[in-house]
Every structure is written in structure tokens, then in C-alpha cells.
């Protein structure tokens, strides 16, 4: 099974080698058919502490690194 890749915005870089990325998804409400926005935060591994708050990044699924980290940052979007 291929690894999932998500795109989001870094909302916190206070932890050592970890960033918190907010990923937003949009979908049509099943009854109202209005576009709804929902977001979720993922902790992602940042080996060199190179990503800062506000950066748009891609994160990829990986083996568990800690209790909460199962994602790693692969690239920043231009």
C-alpha cells in the first residue's frame, strides 16, 4: 500500500525536531450540499528544525517515531 502524502501549514515549531502541521480538507455536506472545511493537526518529524510557522509543507506517512509522531516532512511548497 502506498504511503499517504498530505499538504498543510506549519502552526507550531516549538518542539525539538517536531513541527505541528494543520491539514485542511473540504467536502460537500451530505444533506445541505454546502462545501464544509475541516482541519486536523498532525505532528511531523523535522530532522534539521528547518521549517518555521507559516511554511506550507508536504508530510508523508512513516513508521512510528514516538507516541504521537507517524509523519515526516518531505518538502516545503514554493
From Swiss-Prot:
Part of the 30S ribosomal subunit. The keyword Cytoplasm does not apply. GO terms for cellular component: cytosolic small ribosomal subunit. Belongs to the universal ribosomal protein uS17 family. It comes from the Bacteria. NCBIfam families: PRK05610.1, uS17_bact. One of the primary rRNA binding proteins, it binds specifically to the 5'-end of 16S ribosomal RNA. GO terms for molecular function: rRNA binding; structural constituent of ribosome. The keyword RNA-binding applies. This is Small ribosomal subunit protein uS17. Gene3D superfamilies: Nucleic acid-binding proteins. One of its GO terms (biological process) is translation. It comes from Agrobacterium fabrum (strain C58 / ATCC 33970) (Agrobacterium tumefaciens (strain C58)). Keywords: Ribonucleoprotein, Ribosomal protein, RNA-binding, rRNA-binding. Pfam families: Ribosomal_S17.
Amino acid at each position: 500500500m502506498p504511503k499517504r502524502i498530505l499538504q498543510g501549514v506549519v502552526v507550531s515549531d516549538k518542539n525539538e525536531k517536531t513541527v505541528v502541521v494543520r491539514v485542511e480538507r473540504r467536502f460537500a455536506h451530505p444533506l445541505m450540499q454546502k462545501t464544509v472545511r475541516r482541519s486536523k493537526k498532525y505532528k511531523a518529524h523535522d530532522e534539521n528544525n528547518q521549517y518555521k510557522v507559516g511554511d506550507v509543507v508536504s508530510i508523508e506517512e512513516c513508521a512510528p517515531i514516538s507516541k504521537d509522531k507517524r509523519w515526516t516532512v518531505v518538502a516545503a511548497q514554493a
